[in-house]
Design a protein with these regions (language model features):
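Short, flexible loop/turn elements at secondary-structure junctions
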Residues: 9-10, 490-492
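Active-site-adjacent bridging/hinge elements
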Residues: 1, 14, 20-22, 433-441, ...
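Extended amphipathic alpha-helical scaffold segments
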Residues: 22-411, 449, 453-473, 482-487, ...
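Short capping/hinge segments at domain boundaries that bridge a core fold to an adjacent linker or tail
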Residues: 2-27, 41
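Extended assembly/interaction regions that build large supramolecular complexes
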Residues: 407-427
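Repeat-mediated protein-protein interaction surfaces in helical alpha-solenoids
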Residues: 442, 446, 476-481
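Extended repeat-based interaction scaffolds and adjacent low-complexity, acidic/S/T/P-biased segments
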Residues: 425-452, 462
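Extended charged low-complexity segments that act as oligomerization/scaffolding linkers
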Residues: 13, 49-54, 514, 519-555
Length: 555
């Protein structure tokens, strides 16, 4: 029968009283910023300084300048914390907007990073996954402290005109957190405050990135937050975010306004280039030398037209990373499943198909984009696994389209140097009909294959399909409709392989929807050989790089 507090208000108050005695001596109290016991008291001091005048400024502004000049970075952080935590934060922030946005937004960026930390708290407490993993979970998975957000968000939204055209990962992080950690509506059905406005700001920032990359700006570091933030607003701005995602996935013409902004910059650059050629002899000489360099012959390659399900051109790698690795596409899956399926296929299939003559490949080119994180094969690595749970019908149709596409590519490669029919698996159904699924033992082995790093996204997707079907069986659900769809619309022996594993998981299905599998006995011979080799599918070296917890989970 006791109450335990995780703070010590009395001690914080006592320390604050001491700090008020030395508030004018910034270097003296700044040395205490490295001691966590003094953090709360120093934040109170910062709020106290906001209300003390020193000639034309407040003591807070003076202290910030002194702390910055003397390289007391922790003291600067504490003062920024005080600004965010103050009951009158919106007014104080607005009064200092020029300070925050000046000097290349140094203080603005730091303020947003500090705010994100103090306005959130770990949501993974008590997992006990190991010291390093616990720290990672605490940093990555956080829930918001709701009361601390409204003043800062009102300030950001009020300054949206001044922030237009700026690109800030710190701002994107704040926006993404609010959009992902709050519901769309409140209990009475009213719209959650700030969601739509922040989604518009995130999308405007993403459009600026699109313009900058369109006229040649290169981002030297990966910035997935600039893409996941607008994706998180897919439910708030379904049309606008959907169109933007289709553009970046190469499935829609670039927005007319974006084209105009890119052309405007290009015209200005061309003018500057022409003027510099006239007045700068050294610049002109360098330009002429570059013009005389012959184009590289390179290897003999034939570029193919874009695949019907793929992108129409080069896809932004940061957008692909944000969607696949950072799970940003899940926002589209919830808001617009059909559009998400189209984008997912475009990101999975290679965006610039080509064939290199004279080269020898150890694996068949299935027309997929190389995805480093899809090796070794595991169902949870595929975006189709959550897609199948969020929007089963749309996800299954998209997955079927992917498997059929890859199988068609396999057949085209195999039949390039042979004649006759494509080898396959012929099944007989209860109504007397027959159907041949392309591929023999190699294609049959795709769902549990680890022999290709380039085609890992396909293998993980097939593994995700198998896992989803077995989970539904475990939950007592009927999968007859899904099995019928796979038989009816699929063209690949890889899908038959998945269903063989499902039949092994629930043998009673062989007397019902999976009875057709018994009409091709070789399937079970191939499966027996696959089981004998299954021990080699665990790639210990690769899993060990992800840490002990992931190694044990994969094993």
């Amino acid at each position: 029968n006791r109450i335990e507090f995780e703070h010590d208000l009395a001690a914080d108050w006592a320390r604050f009283q001491f700090l008020k005695q030395i508030w004018a001596d910034t270097p003296k109290w700044a040395t205490l910023a490295g001691n966590p016991l003094w953090t709360n008291a120093l934040r109170m001091l910062g709020q106290f300084l906001l209300r003390q005048r020193v000639e034309a400024e407040t003591a807070w502004d003076v202290a910030l300048g002194v702390a910055g000049a003397t390289n007391h970075e922790l003291a600067v952080d504490i003062l920024l914390d005080a600004l965010c935590l103050d009951p009158d934060a919106e007014r104080f922030l607005t009064e200092r907007v020029d300070l925050l946005l000046g000097n290349e937004e140094k203080h603005f960026t730091r303020l947003l990073l500090r705010f994100h930390h103090i306005a959130t708290m770990p949501s993974s407490a008590g997992l006990r996954l190991g010291t390093a993993l616990d720290l990672y979970m605490e940093a990555q998975y956080r829930s918001i402290v709701f009361g601390r957000w409204p003043p800062v968000l009102r300030f950001l939204i009020a300054q949206r005109e001044r922030l237009a055209g700026r690109v800030s990962s710190a701002l994107a992080k704040v926006i993404e957190t609010w959009l992902t950690k709050t519901p769309q509506t409140l209990g009475a059905g009213d719209r959650m405050p700030f969601r739509r406005e922040l989604a518009e700001m995130a999308l405007a920032m993403a459009r600026t990135v699109q313009v900058e990359k369109g006229h040649g700006v290169m981002y030297l570091t990966r910035e997935p937050l600039l893409y996941t933030a607008p994706l998180a607003g897919a439910a708030d701005l379904p049309t606008e975010v959907g169109n933007w995602a289709l553009e970046l996935a190469g499935r829609r013409e670039v927005d007319a306004e974006v084209k105009r902004r890119i052309a405007e910059v290009q015209v200005q650059k061309a003018k500057e280039h022409a003027e510099r050629l006239k007045v700068d002899a050294e610049y002109k000489a360098r330009h002429e030398r570059r013009e005389r360099i012959p184009a590289s012959l390179g290897s003999f390659r034939e570029r193919f037209p874009p695949w019907p399900l793929g992108a129409s051109g080069k896809v932004d790698m940061d957008f692909r990373t944000a969607c696949i690795k950072e799970n940003g596409i899940q926002f589209l899956m919830r808001a617009q499943p059909a559009l998400a399926g189209e984008v997912l296929l475009a990101l999975t299939i290679e965006d610039q198909p080509e064939r290199e003559y004279g080269s020898s490949r150890l694996e068949v080119d299935l027309g997929l984009e190389y995805t480093r994180d899809a090796y070794p094969t595991a169902f949870w690595k595929s975006p189709f696994f959550p897609f199948l749970q969020l929007a089963p019908e749309t996800a299954l149709a998209s997955l079927l389209a992917l498997v059929n596409f890859c199988t068609d590519r396999w057949a085209a490669e195999v039949m390039r140097e042979r004649t006759g029919e494509v080898p396959g698996v012929t099944l007989q159904f209860a109504d007397g009909s027959q159907k041949t699924f392309m591929g023999r033992r190699q294609v049959f082995g795709w769902p549990q294959s680890n022999d290709s790093m380039r085609n890992g996204s396909l293998f993980c997707s097939l593994d995700a399909l198998e896992r989803w079907l077995t989970q539904r069986l475990d939950s007592g659900e009927d999968i007859s409709a899904e099995v019928e769809k796979l038989f009816r619309e699929g063209n690949s022996a890889a899908l038959v392989s998945v269903l063989v594993n499902v039949a092994k998981f629930r043998p009673s299905l062989l007397t019902g929807p999976l009875a057709a599998l018994l009409t091709f006995p070789n399937l079970f011979q191939w499966d027996s050989a696959r089981v004998e080799q299954i021990g080699y599918n665990f790639i210990a070296l690769s899993w060990s790089r992800d840490g002990q917890a992931m190694f044990d989970f994969a094993r």
